Amino acid sequence: MAAAAAAGEARRVLVYGGRGALGSRCVQAFRARNWWVASVDVVENEEASASIIVKMTDSFTEQADQVTAEVGKLLGEEKVDAILCVAGGWAGGNAKSKSLFKNCDLMWKQSIWTSTISSHLATKHLKEGGLLTLAGAKAALDGTPGMIGYGMAKGAVHQLCQSLAGKNSGMPPGAAAIAVLPVTLDTPMNRKSMPEADFSSWTPLEFLVETFHDWITGKNRPSSGSLIQVVTTEGRTELTPAYF
């Protein structure tokens, strides 16, 4: 009974990237459960309980300090049950591409900056036993010659996740850092850019939202440092840990 009651209580969640396709779904789903949900993004999410607007800048320290200060002001001494970093994006290009530097810069900003800031926020504002999720990529478990910046950025996120699970990482006691490694998410933007693709191999956003819900409430939560591959085949999605 106690576990069932705990699973039903109102939670507090911070969604980093709360106006993206997956982030918006997370905000909607958790608000519908009467959870308190804060969105952190470059634009406001009006459906969230609170929104923090990230200022665009070419300085990582500037952006990190701004977000850290504003989240600190918003939360005060209150702790959150989960920080879901679902920010990210995609850009292609090999090492010879004219757009290599520009695309690498974009990937680092969208994936590494956001994941690093989320990790620091977790050390300050996550409850003991809380959850931090990071957005990795299955493709980055191997070389990604056609998308150099993307692969580097996601590879760094995987490494960060494993570091956070180690001793003296700064994470709260009992808290877990878990990276999800999808192949392709079924978003409106992806459908628009790849209209001929096999959508039955794309992961529905709802699947990840429900997975996050389970992990937040302690159901089937993998151990900290896990890199969880999210693979959809013919409309069926499975979660499989990546081992090295």
From Swiss-Prot:
The keyword Transmembrane does not apply. Keywords: Acetylation, Disease variant, NADP, Oxidoreductase, Phenylketonuria, Tetrahydrobiopterin biosynthesis. Changing residue 17 to R: In HPABH4C; severe. Changing residue 151 to S: In HPABH4C; mild. Changing residue 150 to C: In HPABH4C; mild. One of its GO terms (cellular component) is mitochondrion. Its EC number is 1.5.1.34. InterPro entries: NAD(P)-bd_dom_sf, Sc_DH/Rdtase_CS, SDR_fam. CDD domains: DHPR_SDR_c_like (cd05334). The modification N6-succinyllysine is found at residues 73, 79, 96, 102. GO terms for biological process: amino acid metabolic process; dihydrobiopterin metabolic process; L-phenylalanine catabolic process; tetrahydrobiopterin biosynthetic process. PROSITE patterns: ADH_SHORT. It is an enzyme of class 1 (oxidoreductase). PANTHER family: DIHYDROPTERIDINE REDUCTASE. Catalyzes the conversion of quinonoid dihydrobiopterin into tetrahydrobiopterin. This is Dihydropteridine reductase. It comes from Homo sapiens (Human).
